[in-house]
């Protein structure tokens, strides 16, 4: 069984994901992690010995409508990329821990019929 965890931006999203990863691995479940290439997860996840897959994602500023266009384009692009990745690794489930990167990853899983769990602790 393989489970993909996803989250990004702050340690508040990453630390709970790493705790779940530890428990899953103790039970023999393979874990992969989807995050942003510039967030704290890009350092913490590999340091924990978990395979890391980067996806682009960003928030938007309501005062600057073009930032919404950029964010939506990134969601669309990263959703397609996540679907390609899922086709290769065939995860049994996806768990989203928050952060903008969780949107395209969960969306791709839902579109492919992969069970999605959302754990937003804050």
Model-identified regions with their sequence ranges:
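Conserved nucleotide-sugar phosphate-binding/catalytic loop shared by glycosyltransferases and other
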Residues: 2-7, 26-84
């Amino acid at each position: 069984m393989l489970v993909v965890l996803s989250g990004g931006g702050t340690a508040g999203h990453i630390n709970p994901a790493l705790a779940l990863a530890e428990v899953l691995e103790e039970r023999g479940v393979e874990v992969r992690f989807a995050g942003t290439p510039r967030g704290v997860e890009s350092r913490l996840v590999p340091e924990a010995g978990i395979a890391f897959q980067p996806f682009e994602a960003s928030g938007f500023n309501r005062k600057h409508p073009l930032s919404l266009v950029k964010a939506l384009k990134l969601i669309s692009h990263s959703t397609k990329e996540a679907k390609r990745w899922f086709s290769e690794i065939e995860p049994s489930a996806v768990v989203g821990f928050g952060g903008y990167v969780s949107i395209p990853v969960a969306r791709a899983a839902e579109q492919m019929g992969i069970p999605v769990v959302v754990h937003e602790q804050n």
